[in-house]
Amino acid sequence: KKYQIHLQNHYDATSRQVQKKEIKVLKKRKNLLIGEVFPYQICLESTMEYSRFMLWFEKEVQKIVKELWNQHFIIKLTLSQLHFRETILFLEHLKDFSKRITIEFIGEDTPEIKKHFSVQEQEAFFIGKLRMLKKWKFIISKHIEGCSVEQTLAFTPCLHEIKYTMSQQARMEENIIDLHMFIDFWEYWAIHKKLKFVVEVKEADFITKSLMHKKVHVQFENA
């Protein structure tokens, strides 16, 4: 096997309870794990390999959600993966478990074969696919880092959750007041649109405590 599944816990920073388990993929070489694999990278590099990978990934995910029947899971995709039939089939085959799966859409590169579409055409396509996934009862989450505010606002009616992942670099570079203003805007938008807003951090630090004091919903990852 080229790949191996790794489950990463996402905790609520206040209760310290596991909320969800993210289904990650690690790459193996000569039985050594050599780092995380991102499906969209495979998708960009080779459609044949992506097809094989998604068949393998589907079997592994099915096995996990059946075994851990009382858990909620996160699967991270990019919007551009929705252009590929393999992705849609993968999600369609998981419909029976959709209420226990959050699909998190993260930053991305648009495939070369789709770059001739206008921004408006791309947006309309993605909105159609997100509506379909919502109809299938998946929980739809959109990361707001690395994408335009306009895009997130346009997709809002199709979402259950908006999420901001705070990297170590961002913490060092951001002015703490600017950061709080940024968080305040998205928290207001989420309340106004009846969405959940989550700030994800790598570990508990002073910024996490500051956000928790404001009663922002904070999650942190742990291996």
What are the residue ranges of the model-derived segments?
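Bacterial c-di-GMP phosphodiesterase EAL domain
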Residues: 1-97, 188
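The catalytic core of metal-dependent phosphodiesterases that act on cyclic dinucleotides
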Residues: 95-174, 184-223
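Short, conserved loop/turn and helix-capping segments at secondary-structure boundaries
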Residues: 44, 176-180
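Acidic-and-aromatic substrate-binding clefts and catalytic sites of carbohydrate-active enzymes
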Residues: 51-55, 78-86, 110-113, 170-175, ...
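Conserved acetyl-CoA-binding loop-helix of GNAT-fold acetyltransferases
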Residues: 56, 179-183
